[in-house]
Regions:
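Long C-terminal interaction/binding lobes of large macromolecular proteins
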Residues: 1-237
Length: 237
């Protein structure tokens, strides 16, 4: 079963999860959106869609951990979906389509990075090479041409961050163990996939218990809905 649009029911979620399992791990979160163009949308738009889709499976919270770079401490980060979505552009057209940036006498025509761009940049080598790869992909035109495109990177990055604030979800942290500072970067597609995976495996556990107890099929168990299903589960030894 191929899902069109985000899964809106438990049955649709199970099928979306099943379809995504056959794909490479980095793509699974995107596939939850059920959109063939998901990897060609601006990263911030994908982030907002995934937050809205998966937030209901996590109680509206986004949790992650990051290792302190200077001591063995592991830092926990918990954000709310509502707070993150509040950072999204308020106008529907703000984060879509090409835009222009004037920089040192140049008129740069740019587009925002997409998940497909990030995947391509990941294979470019080190961080500097990845940044240059993204600039080459997202710079549509420069008038007059740039002699050294990398010199424009700071200005381009700042303009993209202003236009698409959910393009990178980063949280500054202070380690309680050593007092050092670090930054947590949230991989929203990976978080959304983990949330879906946890939710579906819990559903399948419930299906397994009720199927053994009553002989029902998966479809029949999921059709009960969460409240009736919970009531039956209370009665299973």
């Amino acid at each position: 079963m191929t899902v069109v649009g985000p899964p809106s029911t438990e049955v649709a979620l199970v099928h979306a999860w099943d379809d995504a399992l056959g794909q490479p791990a980095p793509r699974r979160g995107l596939l939850l959106l059920g959109r063939p163009d998901a990897d060609r949308l601006p990263v911030g738009e994908v982030t907002a869609l995934l937050l809205a889709t998966a937030g209901g499976w996590t109680g509206g919270r986004v949790a992650t951990t990051v290792d302190c770079p200077t001591c063995p401490e592991q830092l926990e980060v918990t954000l709310t979906v509502a707070d993150l979505l509040a950072a999204a552009p308020q106008r529907a057209d703000r984060a879509t389509g090409p835009f222009t940036l004037r920089w040192r006498g140049h008129r740069l025509t740019l587009r925002l990075p997409t998940p497909a761009d990030l995947a391509g940049a990941a294979g470019a080598g080190d961080a500097a090479a990845a940044e240059r790869w993204l600039l080459d992909a997202c710079l549509l035109d420069a008038d007059p041409p740039l002699a050294d495109p990398s010199a424009a990177l700071p200005a381009v990055s700042a303009a993209m961050a202003e236009r698409d604030p959910l393009g990178v979800v980063a949280v500054a942290l202070t380690c309680p163990g050593c007092g050092g500072g670090t930054e947590a970067l949230l991989d929203v597609p990976a978080w959304a996939w983990h949330a879906a995976d946890v939710r579906v495996r819990r559903l399948l556990d419930e299906v397994h218990r009720l199927a053994r107890a009553y002989g029902w099929s998966e479809a029949e168990v999921l059709a009960l809905g969460p409240h009736r299903r919970a009531a039956y589960l209370e009665r299973v030894p």
